[in-house]
């Protein structure tokens, strides 16, 4: 039984899909006017992992993640660069895919662009106007929040107490400060489409509601995104969607927490961000994913070079274990398991059970990773050159099986690990000959951090995994 923390009801709930065995999931994607930063990257990695885990547990997942390709920021960027909004969108959608692929983020079932749904959006807006939930002023159309009885139920805020916030534009023409634009009249130099209210373009909130309804249906299983979208974006999506259809918009709302730098949220507005591409130039995707999944997705995560280095060492330790098993598969002479090995392999299932228990509990990736470390500690100790090829192969398959939903530990290290370790041992031996004991100790400690212990014997230096 999978339990998820539902932001809407402020508690963990058993996940029961609308259709048995299927998950309809919508995740708010990027506004494509720049490279995405690693804070956005955490959101994409988290919900990619959740999608993968549902699939691992046997669900068919319809996974929709949109591109916002018409927006104030995009218009500003296009004007600055003397190009069109469409060209900006085309460019950064391509760049998104390049970075997301590099982070081993699986492609969505559909990545809709808002501009591909203008006709549907106009119908959606008209439906709200016809029902009395929206009103037109000088070509702009606003949603009347006071008309929707449940406004504020996601964020837990009372509409009477809400004030115009930083992300809510103040406009004297609105009937209430909390009303928000679902259609915007054209301004000079802006792209626009013909509508019953004149030339204009959609508001941000209406885009996601419309695309989710069109691609997944009036009610979906999961709507997800970063916690900064909870209000007003997701609150507004609920209001306009449920006002139009009269049905619940999403049964479960999931929100990933911020990535912080120096205890402040990473954001482009604070100019304290690192793009995913910048980090990918220096660290492998497994390292970045490991860091992003090393804390529960609802916990804020601090980002620093030290934490990246720590994640790198942890990933190397797991790949060392993988490499050790790959080498054993090539080197051991006995093919099949004996009865004792079959019993030992069966005992390894406790790590899989622990992993599933933790992931079933609101996708606790941090504890799931701990279960993988416990597994490799066991295999490092008990699978040796005297073991069978079959046992080493089965253990390797189990490590990869548990790594797959996390999007990690799938690469082969064949030939690389042993050569790298032997080279470091040779370097250490030379340092000792040169009486550079500081360097020799540093190499020994570096190997130990990676789970490799050196033993000085009369026959020379030997190494083993721990």
UniProtKB/Swiss-Prot annotation:
Location of the motif 'KMSKS' region: 265-269
Binding, ATP: 268
Motif residue range(s): 'HIGH' region: 30-40
Cofactor note (record): Binds 1 zinc ion per subunit.
Places the protein is found: Cytoplasm
Needed cofactors: Zn(2+)
The protein's name: Cysteine--tRNA ligase
Organism whose genome encodes this protein: Clostridium perfringens (strain ATCC 13124 / DSM 756 / JCM 1290 / NCIMB 6125 / NCTC 8237 / Type A)
Lineage: Bacteria, Bacillati, Bacillota, Clostridia, Eubacteriales
Gene that produces this protein: cysS
